[in-house]
Every structure is written in C-alpha cells, then in structure tokens.
From Swiss-Prot:
Signal peptide (UniProt feature, chain positions): none
Key words, A-Z: Carbohydrate metabolism, Glycogen biosynthesis, Glycogen metabolism, Glycosyltransferase, Transferase
Pathway it works in: Glycan biosynthesis; glycogen biosynthesis
Any Gene Ontology biological process: glycogen biosynthetic process
Pfam families (UniProt xref): Alpha-amylase, Alpha-amylase_C, CBM_48, GlgB_N
Protein name: 1,4-alpha-glucan branching enzyme GlgB
Organism: Escherichia coli O6:H1 (strain CFT073 / ATCC 700928 / UPEC)
Length: 728
C-alpha cells in the first residue's frame, strides 16, 4: 500500500464521509507502481484481471475488514483496462471497476448547466444507460452542490451507500458516476450526506420513470426517442383553427367496474381516444400526469416532473396513448406545473440540505394555500431544470401544447398573502420579476425550438399581455384562459331568468376586453369541485329548465369568440360534482334515450358544426369576426350577434335566456337572403320543446336596428340558435 493513503482516509471513505472517492479508488500511479484500490464491502478476495486473457494480474490485499482492498500491479507503468474478480459469500463475480472511468460530463455541458442555458439538461443529468470503453452500464449525474457526499444506491448494490460514492464536479456542483452493469428497469436513488451532515435519500429530479406511490424510487430508463411534429398537428394549434378541448383526469374518466381500478394508458387509448374523436373534440387536455405522491392533488403537486405517473402504466404505455391520439387527429395538451412542488422529503425539498430548488425565505418560497414550495426562478440551474422539462414533453413525447397552471401565483409576490407576508422586488413592486422572465424565456425557447407547439396560461388576474409577444412586453403565451368570461357567464346562468335582465352586462362585458388576449373559454375541472356543484346543478328551475339552460349556455359558449374547453362529464350533463376517486357517471347514459343523451348529442353537434364553419373560429381574435346585432334587449334577455370568416360569410347566433318563447322577434341583419337553421339547442333531438323556425327563414326588406334588411324569428325558450345564409 502507498503511504499516501492513511487510516483517516479509509475510515472516512468507509463511513461515507469522503467527498472525493476517485482520488483514492481505482487505478493510481504511486511510488510503488500502478496501484488498484477498491471499496467492496463483504468481499473476501479480490483479484485484478486482464480482460482479454482472463489472467489474474494481482491479488488485492484487504487493508480493512470493512471492505477496503489495495494492491500493486507488477511490471505495469501505464494505465490499462482491467476488471476485478470479487468473491462474495463464496461466489466469484467478475465486475468492472466504476472508478477506472474518467469524467462523464463534457466541459461544455458542465458550463451550460452552470449558466442555466443548456436547452436539454435531461440529456446530461439523470440516469442514462450507456456504453463506456466497451462496458455497458448506466451513467448517473445529479446536481447537489452543497452535499458533502452523494452515492448512487439501488437494486444493483443492495441499496448500500458505501459501494458507489460519486465524483463531484466542483465547477458545476454536479455529482457523477458510471456504474457498469446497472441497466434499464432497475430502481435507484441518491443517498447523500447533506450540507448539515444529515443522511438523506432522494429520488432523481431528472428520472424518466418512477415507482408508483407510496414507493418513491426512480427507475433507470432510456431517454425516449424524439417525436416528429407534423404539419397537421401544427395547423391544429393555430389562431384561426377550430380548437375544442376535452379536459380529462385520466384516473377518473372511466374505471373498471369490478374493482374501481384505473384504466391503463393503453386502455384509455382504446376507449377515451375514440370517444373524444366521435364527440368532435380537436384536443385532449390531460390534468398533470407527472409523477406525484398524493392522488388528491390531481397531479398538481408533482415530484417527478420528467416521469409520467406509473398509476396507468409505463413511460412507453403513455407514448402509446399519445400516438393513438395523434392517429385519431387529436392534439394533446398537458397541464404543466412549474409554479410549486410539494414538501415531501424524498423529492426536491431541501434537496442537498439547503434550499436548492426553493427560496429560503418562506415569504418567497412557501405557498400557504397549498402547503407547497415555490421554485427559485432566479437560480439559473432551477430555471434550466424547468425550461428543459417543457421542451422534454414536447420533443420526446409529442405533446402539442402546455397549459401552465396557476400563473398568477407565480408572477405576483403577494399572491394570496397579507401585508408583511411577502417581500417586494428590487424596485419595491409586487411582481415576481424572476418568474416573469422565466415564463418569457420558456415561451421564447419553445417558439424557437419546437415551432407549432403552443402554451396556454391559466392566469386569473388582469396582468397585461399574457398572450402577447415578449417584444411587446408580453409573457409570450399563445393563449390565455378567460376566467373572467367563465365567472361572469356562470354567475348569469345561475340566476332565475326573472332576474337576468338586471345582470345583462355579465354576458356582454366580455366583448369589451375580448381582443386584449387570445382567449380560451374554459369550463374546467375547477368549476365542478369544492362545493361549487356541477354545471348542470347550477342552472335554475326544474329538471326541464336546468337542461334547457345548460343547452342554451353551451350554444352561447361555442359561438362566442375564443377557443373552447370542457371538462369531462359536462358533455353529458353529469349531475354531481367531480370525484377524482370514482368514474364519471356513465350510467346516466344507460337505458332509454334521456336528457343526458340530449346534451351529449348537442355537444357533439356543436363541435362538428363549429369545426365545419370557418366563421365560428377563423377570426376569434380579430374584431372583424364578431358583430352585435342585438345587444341591449335586457328586458327580454335576448342577445344576437354575428360571427364572420375572412371572406365575410356570416353566421347569426341568437339566444333567449328566458323560458318565454319570443315569436316574431325582428332584428336587422347585414346580408339579406334565406337563412337556414343549422343548430337549435331547443330541438327535440336534444330533448327540447322543438320550437323554432321550420328549418329556415327569409329576410324581409324591413329596416330594423339601423339596417335595411331584417329577420323575423321565433326564439325558442331557454335556447340558442345558429343560422347560416344559403348561397344565392
């Protein structure tokens, strides 16, 4: 043994308190010659082997009964490839020494990761099956700059943190190690002695797969192949495209009837995908599928941002689901949560014993409402972790859009906080400048790297320019949820019709700000939980009126400017609130034809009619695409407007939000001729009263509402009708 290795070093190494194992272990030049040292707990004999011949070159001496071996190779001066023959419990095993391999992360990668500008950090960090110097294994790397020691533990080393301590790259704070023989499918974690001397066991922030709760280990898994983005998928996201989104929680859309267990990704591909296609939706939006420990969070408190949840199957099963959606002509939107993460000890919280991913001050780093931690967007490595994750889902899974959750909680430092509970920014303001820059940067990078994919913001305030370009001072999102429209219209619809005349502006106010953003009109999962009731149950009146109100509302929503979003169950008027632990009430559609079938047929017809007529979607964000015909008839709660396409073709939309049919209702129009009724929410086909206009009506050369020509219609009770002018 070389006199350079003293007993204190051996003790520290065996105790797991030595931060630089490569300085001791592996092959080293010493005054005595080439010396090989190995830490192999429980081994009894160790030989150095010549791989080509299998010849034993030297037997290593056991210098410590806890497993430290060392020996000099005679007549060798230059480093060479070797193996170790190790006897454990009477059985000899031939292994490759992890400590004979050089640094793994290239200097450029290390620099980019430290700068926070590595577009795809997941290609370097995490666990990657690889072949090095002809040896198959897995290279591991994890960012933990303040840890005193980090080891890889897993099924390949008996979860023993003494066996595979990692190399620290001080310039980046990244620990790395290549472990020969570790392979896909094996479980692993990082064992570390943190900055405070505490022993911690952490899952991999960059793991591509993870165990299903309540277990928390990561799985070695190869990086998915890139998914080519097609022109059809790009076009389906554009501003002039028809976008009708079916929002789904995969764990409760439908369950196995015999045991109430979830459907798998592949079963959902076979059932959910064809259903959404048949219903006429253009997009599927998935509540977060990132791995998460608590079912009741619905996925909005993720611990594995890079890992699809194992609740429904493997990573490849999820890819199969997305491929099936694309084959059916459906784009896929993923709810993405870069705003906060849970406090679970096995995940990101105090990752290396310090507030690495989160702010240290709870006034900046703690969400009081959700008992979660807030990312420190000003830290370059943290921002890089998140930006890379956005790119990962789009490039590696073919996700077509990201819907960013709780944007308001990110961009305001005083979000849901009282005075004294938040820290102003450097200019004394309430805006979180680092979060704003992070969102702008994310949207910019996605626009540059994956043209055609888009982002949508759930932003609940009037922050200006959410869906405006960064060079105009905006955040750079493509779309923003119109939560104001949603609240106003639902508040209106829950009123008894006799009182609606006093709240007429709740339906018209949205047009005053409609062109300030690129809006999506959402009836999301948030509107059918926490005692808010189902959408159907918010409607006033008896059963007939409830369904009629709902149908009229849907007819209004699908005609109003903006893309559409409907949470699962609302398409057939589920009567109870959503329960994430149970299937939707599909039994409502069993037996004979009923009101629920009627609503389902209406939503299907709305989708198909909306998609067929460009006037209903082509100019959602252009004032030319909309015009009021009747806006002030609050006494009768009647509203009529025109939707228009680029060629000037018009569709008339008329809504009567009282149970009183309005006969001979005359209003002025722009284009005289024969107007055909293409949708009537009061049709008997939808279980309405079947009032209407006999399928079509001719205009009269009678002036009305400042226009030379007019129509005289029957407006059915609690109904919305659409009319299109037939060609001459």
């Amino acid at each position: 043994m070389s006199d350079r290795i003293d007993r204190d070093v051996i003790n520290a190494l065996i105790a797991g308190h030595f931060a630089d194992p490569f300085s001791v272990l592996g092959m080293h030049k010493t005054t005595a010659g080439l010396e090989v040292r190995a830490l192999l707990p429980d081994a009894t004999d160790v030989w150095v082997i010549e791989p080509k011949t299998g010849r034993k070159l030297a037997k290593l001496e056991c210098l410590d009964s806890r497993g430290f071996f060392s020996g000099v190779i005679p007549r060798r001066k230059n480093f060479f490839r070797y193996q170790l023959a190790v006897v454990w419990h009477g059985q000899q095993n031939l292994i490759d020494d992890p400590y004979r391999f050089g640094p793994l992360i290239q200097e450029m990668d290390a620099w980019l990761l430290s700068e926070g500008t590595h577009l795809r950090p997941y290609e370097t960090l995490g666990a990657h099956a690889d072949t090095m110097d002809g040896v198959t294994g897995t290279r591991f790397s994890v960012w933990a700059p303040n840890a005193r020691r980090v080891s890889v533990v897993g099924q390949f080393n008996y979860w023993d943190g003494r066996r595979h301590p990692m190399r620290l790259r001080k310039e980046s704070g990244i620990w790395e190690l290549f472990i020969p023989g570790a392979h896909n499918g094996q479980l692993y974690k990082y064992e570390m002695i943190d900055a405070n001397g505490n022993l911690r066991l952490k899952s991999d922030p960059y793991a591509f797969e993870a165990q299903m709760r309540p277990e928390t280990a990561s799985l070695i898994c190869s990086l998915p192949e890139k998914v080519v983005q097609t022109e059809e998928r790009k076009k389906a996201n554009q501003f002039d495209a028809p976008i009708s989104i079916y929002e789904v929680h995969l764990g409760s859309w439908r369950r196995h009837t015999d045991n109430n267990f979830w459907l798998s990704y592949r079963e959902l591909a076979d059932q959910l995908v064809p259903y959404a296609k048949w219903m006429g939706f253009t997009h599927l939006e998935l509540l977060p599928i990132n791995e998460h420990p608590f079912d009741g969070s619905w996925g909005y408190q993720p611990t594995g941002l890079y890992a699809p949840t194992r609740r429904f199957g493997t990573r490849d099963d999820f890819r199969y689901f997305i491929d099936a959606a694309h084959a059916a002509g459906l784009n896929v939107i993923l709810d993405w949560v870069p705003g906060h993460f849970p406090t679970d000890d096995f995940a990101l919280a105090e990752f290396d014993g310090t507030n690495l991913y989160e702010h240290s001050d709870p006034r900046e780093g703690y969400h009081q409402d959700w008992n979660t931690l807030i990312y420190n967007y000003g830290r370059r490595e943290v921002s890089n972790f998140l930006v890379g994750n956005a790119l990962y889902w789009i490039e590696r899974f073919g996700i077509d859009a990201l819907r960013v959750d709780a944007v308001a909680s990110m961009i305001y430092r005083d979000y849901s906080r009282k005075e004294g509970e938040w820290i102003p920014n450097e200019f004394g303001g309430r805006e979180n400048l680092e979060a704003i820059e992070f969102l702008r940067n994310t949207n910019r990078i996605l626009g540059e790297q994956v043209s055609g994919a888009v982002t949508m913001a759930e932003e609940s305030t009037d922050f200006p320019g959410v869906s405006r370009p960064q060079d105009m001072g905006g955040l750079g999102f493509w779309y923003k949820w119109n939560l104001g429209w949603m609240h106003d219209t639902l508040d209106y619809m829950k009123l008894d019709p006799i009182y609606r005349q006093y709240h007429h502006d709740k339906l018209t106010f949205g047009m005053l700000y409609n062109y300030t953003e690129n809006f999506v009109l959402p009836l999301s999962h948030d509107e059918v939980v926490h005692g808010k009731k189902s959408i159907l149950d918010r409607m006033p009146g008896d059963a007939w009126q409830k369904f009629a109100n709902l149908r009229a509302y849907y007819g209004w929503m699908w005609a109003f400017p903006g893309k559409k979003l409907l949470f699962m169950g609302n398409e057939f008027a589920q009567g109870r609130e959503w329960n994430h632990d149970a299937s939707l009430d599909w039994h409502l559609l069993e037996g004979g034809d009923n009101w629920h079938h009627g609503v389902q047929r209406l939503v299907r017809d709305l989708n198909h009619t909306y998609r067929h007529h460009k006037a209903m979607h082509e100019l959602d964000f252009d004032p030319y695409g909309f015009e009021w015909l009747v806006v002030d008839d609050k006494e009768r709660s009647v509203l009529i407007f025109v939707r228009r396409d680029k060629e000037g073709n018009e569709i008339i939309v008329a809504s009567n939000f009282t149970p009183v049919p309005r006969h001979d209702y005359r209003f002025g129009i722009n284009q005289p001729g024969k107007w055909r009724e293409i949708l009537n929410t009061d049709s008997m086909h939808y279980h309405g009263s079947n009032a209407g206009n006999g399928g079509a009506v001719h205009s009269d050369e009678i002036a009305s509402h400042g226009r030379q020509h007019s129509l005289s219609l029957t407006l059915p009770p609690l109904a919305t009708i659409w009319l299109v002018r037939e060609a001459e």
